[in-house]
Curated annotation (Swiss-Prot):
One of its GO terms (molecular function) is DNA polymerase processivity factor activity. Belongs to the PCNA family. One of its GO terms (biological process) is leading strand elongation. One of the sliding clamp subunits that acts as a moving platform for DNA processing. Responsible for tethering the catalytic subunit of DNA polymerase to DNA during high-speed replication. Heterotrimer stimulates the Holliday junction resolvase Hjc. DNA polymerase I, DNA ligase and the flap endonuclease may be constitutively associated with the PCNA heterotrimer forming a scanning complex able to couple DNA synthesis and Okazaki fragment maturation. This is DNA polymerase sliding clamp 2. The keyword DNA-binding applies. Disulfide bonds: none annotated. Forms homodimers with PCNA1, which then recruit PCNA3; does not form homotrimers. The heterodimers interact with RfcS homotetramers. Heterotrimer which circularizes head-to-tail (head is at N-terminus, tail is at C-terminus) to form a toroid; DNA passes through its center. Replication factor C (RFC) is required to load the toroid on the DNA. This subunit interacts with DNA polymerase I (dpo1). The heterotrimer also interacts with flap endonuclease 1, DNA ligase and XPF via the other subunits. It comes from the Archaea.
Length: 245
């Protein structure tokens, strides 16, 4: 496999986000593109990242399916070295993954491949009563502001408006999002409510560096789905299970 990433900074933030949930992962490489998926150790979050071949400026595969196992910590330690104008070339053989930054000067790093057990993805064929579309930066800024106020994020919808609420020990914070005030691009669905672990939701906000817009789906006592849209119809999906209490 050989793939050239023009926006290496954005790519690095995608993998940093994955690294907040998983310690090890596989690049599943086919002629269609690269997929990374997995379930976090607490089994609260299932993530599914897909970067189509058109996401890359150059994309070469030598076999029908290639599985590239790696430790997120090792890859992210390298990706933290990326500079603003760098391009990134990913290449692999049977034993190693090579990351090459090409910018003002060229730097190459090699990592040994590891065996990562493939996880069976859960069934995510869900009917979501409510859907909203918004800018990723809007979502990330709101969650960042609320994240230190409490451990539980309450989400509810009413009359096509979306509400984020956190009840802390000393105060309660509530944010209204709607198409009227410009915080939602689109919204439709039923009046529903559910609660999710704030830490899991907050760990997705690094995607703002890679994604301009996103979709949010939820319903009463079903997983929250966050779809971060990526260039060339790529996406980053995060399914977060509701809190039981």
């Amino acid at each position: 496999m050989k793939a050239k990433v023009i926006d290496a900074v954005s790519f690095s933030y995608i993998l940093r986000t994955v690294g907040d949930f998983l310690s090890e992962a596989n690049f599943i490489v086919t002629k269609e593109g690269i997929r990374v998926s997995g379930i976090d150790p607490s089994r609260v979050v299932f993530l599914d990242i897909f970067l189509p071949s058109s996401y890359f400026e150059g994309f070469e595969v030598s076999q029908e399916k290639e599985i590239i196992g790696f430790k997120l910590e090792d890859v992210n330690d390298i990706l933290k070295r990326v500079l603003k104008d760098d391009t990134l070339i990913l290449s692999s053989n049977e034993s190693k993954l090579t990351l090459t930054f090409d910018g003002e000067f060229t730097r190459s790093f090699e990592l040994p491949l590891i065996q990562v057990e493939s996880t069976q993805p859960p069934s995510v064929n869900l009917e979501f009563p409510f859907k909203a579309q918004l800018l990723t930066i809007t979502f990330a800024d709101i969650i960042d502001e609320l994240s230190d106020l409490g451990e539980v994020l309450n989400i509810h919808s009413k009359e096509n408006k979306l509400y984020f609420e956190v009840i802390g020990d000393l105060s309660t914070a509530k944010v209204e999002l709607s198409t009227d005030n410009g915080t939602l691009l689109e919204a439709s669905g039923a009046d529903v409510s559910s609660s999710y672990g704030m830490e899991y939701v907050a760990n997705t906000t690094k995607m703002r560096r890679a994604s301009d817009s996103m979709e949010l789906y939820f319903g009463s006592q079903i997983p929250l789905k966050l779809r971060f849209k990526l260039p060339q119809e790529g996406y980053g999906d995060f399914y977060i299970a509701p809190r039981a209490d």
